[in-house]
Amino acid sequence: MPRSLKKGPFVDEHLAKKVTAQNEAGTHNVIKTWSRRSMVTPDMIGHTIGVHDGRKHVPVFVTESMVGHKLGEFAPTRTFKGHVKDDKKARRR
């Protein structure tokens, strides 16, 4: 079930402070965050946010089409290495 419209989007306070500080200063440095649950807001457009995936911070450049999504959607936590091919020739020998 989606979040109620009367509540508004959830953004962690520390992340919102960093974004507004960079907007006022006019800088676009990478903002590191562990807050994967925060929603992308229009004031984040043009910033690069380092979203933690459990191991490292994945740089995510925020565009207009990302508004309304959560930051965690853009930093996958699992790496799929692929299924190992079954080598039947080696087994026969």
Swiss-Prot record:
Gene behind the chain: rpsS
Any one Gene Ontology molecular-function term assigned to this protein's record: rRNA binding
Protein name: Small ribosomal subunit protein uS19
GO biological process: ribosomal small subunit assembly; translation
UniProt xrefs under PANTHER family: RIBOSOMAL PROTEIN S19P FAMILY MEMBER, SMALL RIBOSOMAL SUBUNIT PROTEIN US19M
Gene3D superfamilies in the cross-refs: 30s Ribosomal Protein S19, Chain A
Keyword annotations: Ribonucleoprotein, Ribosomal protein, RNA-binding, rRNA-binding
Organism of this sequence: Cutibacterium acnes (strain DSM 16379 / KPA171202)
The protein's role, per its UniProt record: Protein S19 forms a complex with S13 that binds strongly to the 16S ribosomal RNA.
Gene Ontology CC: cytoplasm; small ribosomal subunit
InterPro entries per the UniProt record, alphabetical: Ribosomal_uS19, Ribosomal_uS19_bac-type, Ribosomal_uS19_CS, Ribosomal_uS19_SF
A Pfam family hit: Ribosomal_S19
Keyword match Zinc: no
Family named by the database record: Belongs to the universal ribosomal protein uS19 family.
